[in-house]
Amino acid sequence: MVATLERREEKRDWGTFATWITSTENRLYIGWFGCLMIPTLLTAASCYIIAFIAAPPVDIDGIREPVAGSLLYGNNIISGAVIPSSNAIGIHFYPIWEAASIEEWLYNGGPYQLIVFHFLIGVACWMGREWELSYRLGMRPWIFVAFSAPVAAASAVFLVYPIGQGSFSDGMPLGISGTFNFMIVFQAEHNILMRPFHMAGVAGVFGGSLFSAMHGSLVTSSLIRETSEVESVNYGYKFGQEEETYNIVAAHGYFGRLIFQYASFNNSRALHFFLAAWPVVGIWLTALGVSTMAFNLNGFNFNQSVVDSEGRVINTWADIINRADLGMEVMHERNAHNFPLDLASNEILPVAISAPSVVG
């Protein structure tokens, strides 16, 4: 009898907990995905703050030349970063218990893996939490779909690319200057500027910004005035009102005359779907591009592709980019190797037409 009562009480406690977790009446919705999201994101954020401030130098190239990234080791907000795991670790999973000591774990960049893995799990759970809340409120799942774009981009940069390159030392450092360093090295090694997927991503991000600005300015310019001239037009809107707050016919007519008729949407729902889909698809394609370049399926190579009738090379913009790539490649990991392979494989160029005569 006692055991039966205890089981009923446990079931009642679990039911109360489940109801609270999945309740849409809470100020912040938690959900089942939130049970995993909260501890992982808190862990990632805590470790990142501590590492950014006080982490010791990391032997990123695996050649016993540590690189300092924290504030206490001479960096500032711009130059500081959490340095990726050592090249000596490669793509091995490197938790604290795999190291002989905390000092060794820090020296080999263990915090980077801890932060990245917890962060990726956390943002994936955030995405799942968006779907869960939409489902419980009876909404369509497009918020979850839209957020999948930055999740895919983060996964491509922090997980897929290091795996494809064979080492987490090739991952993006967690800092401002580290991000730019990653971009420069990525261009040098993969020629991302000549990758169609990257071009689509640029069109998605900049096009999305343009369309957002156009839509916002059109709506703001065609608001239905409900206030006097001396009051802010924003006071004419009441939260939850059923009436349109702007004149879509006027906005459609203006934009149709500004460009041409069919460039303007006459359906508000189709318009907002387009505003969401354009940048999302662009970022999806960028993530796909980074994921394929992780396995060295690089951008197009048009180097020395234009020649005259006598076979002499006519340099194009592609050759200028190639020269810049070689320069960036030489500067990258300057102590890890003396001469990059892609530089050594090029045709030998003479530095002088003839040697000067030296009179003894």
UniProtKB/Swiss-Prot annotation:
Q: Which residues bind pheophytin a?
A: W126
Any single Gene Ontology cellular-component annotation: chloroplast thylakoid membrane
Annotated Fe cation binding sites? H215, H272
Q: In which residues is a quinone bound?
A: H215, S264, F265
GO terms for MF: chlorophyll binding; electron transporter, transferring electrons within the cyclic electron transport pathway of photosynthesis activity; iron ion binding; oxidoreductase activity, acting on diphenols and related substances as donors, oxygen as acceptor
PTM note says: Tyr-161 forms a radical intermediate that is referred to as redox-active TyrZ, YZ or Y-Z. C-terminally processed by CTPA; processing is essential to allow assembly of the oxygen-evolving complex and thus photosynthetic growth.
Q: Could you say which residues are annotated as the site Cleavage? A: A344, S345
Residues binding chlorophyll a ChlzD1 are H118
- Site feature: Stabilizes free radical intermediate: H190
Q: What is its EC number?
A: 1.10.3.9
For this protein, the record's InterPro entries field holds: D1/D2, Photo_II_D1/D2_sf, Photo_RC_L/M, Photo_RC_L/M_CS, PSII_D1
- The residues listed in the UniProt record as binding [CaMn4O5] cluster, with positions renumbered to this chain, are D170, E189, H332, E333, D342, A344
Name the residues that bind chlorophyll a PD1: H198
Do the record's keywords include Heme?
no
Q: List where the protein spans the membrane.
A: 29-46, 118-133, 142-156, 197-218, 274-288
How many cofactor units bind, and how?
A: The D1/D2 heterodimer binds P680, chlorophylls that are the primary electron donor of PSII, and subsequent electron acceptors. It shares a non-heme iron and each subunit binds pheophytin, quinone, additional chlorophylls, carotenoids and lipids. D1 provides most of the ligands for the Mn4-Ca-O5 cluster of the oxygen-evolving complex (OEC). There is also a Cl(-1) ion associated with D1 and D2, which is required for oxygen evolution. The PSII complex binds additional chlorophylls, carotenoids and specific lipids.
Q: Does the keyword Transmembrane apply?
A: yes
What EC class does the entry list? oxidoreductase
| Residue(s) at site: Tyrosine radical intermediate | Y161
GO biological process, alphabetically ordered: photosynthetic electron transport in photosystem II; response to herbicide
Question: Where does the UniProt annotation locate this protein?
Answer: Plastid, Chloroplast thylakoid membrane
Membrane-topology descriptor? Multi-pass membrane protein
Binding partners and assembly: PSII is composed of 1 copy each of membrane proteins PsbA, PsbB, PsbC, PsbD, PsbE, PsbF, PsbH, PsbI, PsbJ, PsbK, PsbL, PsbM, PsbT, PsbX, PsbY, PsbZ, Psb30/Ycf12, at least 3 peripheral proteins of the oxygen-evolving complex and a large number of cofactors. It forms dimeric complexes.
HAMAP family to which the protein is assigned, alphabetical: PSII_PsbA_D1 (MF_01379)
Q: What family is this protein classified in?
A: Belongs to the reaction center PufL/M/PsbA/D family.
- The protein in question is named Photosystem II protein D1
Originating species: Ectocarpus siliculosus (Brown alga)
